[in-house]
Structures are given as structure tokens and as C-alpha cells.
Amino acid sequence: MSGVAAIIAVIHDGKILLTKREDFEVWCLPGGAVEDGESLAEAAIREAKEETGLDVELTRLVGVYSRVGGMWNDMHAVLFAAKPVGGGLTTQPGETIEVAYFSFDKLPEEMLFGHQKRVVDAIHQVSGIAVKQELNMPANDRPSRKELYELRDQSGLSRQEFYLNRISQAEVKEIVEVGGL
């Protein structure tokens, strides 16, 4: 079964806001699952507040990014661009350990797979894109999230090292299905 997520690219003064995930200590755009009774836009605004502490105004629909294959269920992420309109930067215990703005030309290398394309699209004012992101991993190497966290905790590596060694090495094939630069 596929899931749906709302992702937010908060852009302010030539910088983009990223969060560092607690589970693998890599950077990504804020966002998360759409809850029952909630629209995609409402989910984006809620997730921005929960994960960053900011109140945001959505300014543009960047696109839809469909992650297929990989370890868990397929996920369709809808990316909105936004601007901050209130609040203050904070982390969300259990989900984020750091929140920071990055200059467009100084993005962190340690990013969650697939988010590089999303960040670049948001920065370049892309609108209306549909991207299929295929994560190719061996069929026998698809542990559940719980099993993956256990492997991480038993590995002797830092959370980031585990992610970079095990997950980020998977091949990601990105296919622009609609729109683009």
C-alpha cells in the first residue's frame, strides 16, 4: 500500500530550511504523512510547525515525487514551497535534532535519498513537476523499519555512518514524468 506525505521547502533570504533527522542524522526537507481529514496543504503547514517551530504560508506547489521500490511501502510526496510568517526555530523531539537554513550554494552533502532533487527543484522555482524516484535495493535486503533500527543500533557505527554505508549507497533512478527545468 502506498503512502502520501506533504513536504515543505521553506525559503527565506536566499536560503532553504532543512531538518536533521533523529533516526539517521541526515538532512532533509521537513514533512510527513497526511492525517485523516487533512488536506495536503494543511498537512504541509502542520508538519512545518511540528518539525521546525515555524508558521508558514504556502507559496507554490513544486511537484509530486513518487518513491517506488526500496525497503518499505511506496511513498508519494507532494512538495510545496513556503515562506516563514511567524514562530521560531525549534526541533521536534524524537524526529529532528537540528534545524538550519542553508545557502543555495552550500547545501549539506549528507541528505536523505531523493531530497537533493526536491531541494534543487524548489530552489530553481520549478512548478508542476512529477518525478518517479526508483530506489533499487536487493529484494533480500529490505528489513522492516524496526529491524533496520535494530541493525543500526547494533552496527557500532554512528547513525549517520550507518545510513551513509547502508542506505545511501542504494541506486536511485530519477525519471521526470511531467514538467521539469
Role assignments for model-derived ranges:
Residues S2, W72-D74, P93-T96:
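A generic structural micro-feature
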Residues E25-V26, G94-L181:
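Nudix hydrolase/Nudix homology domain
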Residues L54-G63:
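A short coil-to-beta-strand element that immediately follows conserved catalytic motifs
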Residues S66-G88, Q116-S127:
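Active-site-adjacent beta-strand/loop module that shapes the phosphate/pyrophosphate-binding cleft
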Residues M1-I16:
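Conserved N-terminal beta-strand and adjoining loop/helix that marks the start
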Residues I8, L61, F80-A82:
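A structural signal for short, well-ordered beta-strand segments
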Residues H12-E50:
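Conserved Nudix-box catalytic region and its N-terminal flanking loop in Nudix hydrolases
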